[in-house]
Amino acid sequence: MIIPSNRTTREMKINNVVLVTNALKSLGSATKAELAGVTGLSIATCGAVLNDLSQRHEVLALELEVSRGGRPAQRYAYNPNYFSVLSLYAQGSDAAAQIVWSVNSATGESLAQGEIRFLPLTLATFYQQIGSLLADYPNIKALGIGLPGVVVKGTVATCDISVFAGVAVEQQLREKFGIYVQADNDMNYTAWGFYRSSCAGITAPVAYLFKPEVPCLGCGMVINGQVLQGASQFAGEVSNLPFERLDKLPVAEEMAKVIVSLTAIINPATIALSGPKISEALLPELKMLCLQRIPAQHMPQLTYRPSMRQDYLQGIAELTLSNYNLHIAFGE
């Protein structure tokens, strides 16, 4: 008698696939026994998962290991060419903007990067540039979009580039290009990229502050290894802190008030600072101003980032890759 698999059984199988693929990407290559040791699954279960993944070319069977007296063990690796990810963000304002992009393999390696002038400043231009990149790199199956504003469930609530305001950007791009799409705000992606490149493994909160040319301030936070988005994706909108004429203050005073607020609320271990109005020379003054309100033992480490570009692109690529892997596993 054949017993149909229930949802719990299906979810267990999916979890096994995710464990094996994540371990393969982390290790580079591995045998069934090595995967069993890392994942906690049995060798037989790892073998069954690898057989399924090999049949759809998601995993590659490599050379046999040199025998130490027994049967040679087969090594496996995740196929970097199984798909590619396009990470892309628009930065600037209605006065001037550009599109910055990168393409990564299924295992995260950078394949190409570039930037494009965002002219004319229309949705049609934005979608046309994405279409051109998809044509140039036909293996792209997932697209991550970053925008300078508030993005709620794939729809842009507000944006420094007003053409995006109110646009259901995820839905429109999925319908137009037929690929997986996710969109989020610039600071969430950038904070995650900084966390992964500089603070990976730290459970204490980490924050990223960006001071652009325009009178506002952006913030992204990672807590317990997760991006803090909030109940309605409004977390990090520090320009709304109740300080009178905050954006009229000298940059050091404005930043210090926000750093003190973050320290009192989430107590971060590290705060990264970036933007055209920030320099490394500003950090000593910032620390001095903060220490007027914060006891020294609670003062976070301040780290200057000359550019947010690599943090931003890494954040988009890693989060999109992770979510697309789950999308594949669940077959959605």
Give the residues covered by each predicted segment.
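Glycine/GP-enriched mid-protein hinge/lid loop-to-helix segment characteristic of carbohydrate kinases
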Residues: 113, 176-268
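Glycine-rich phosphate-binding loop and adjoining helix at the ATP-binding site
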Residues: 110-197, 202, 285-292
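Conserved protein kinase catalytic core
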Residues: 95, 152, 192, 230, ...
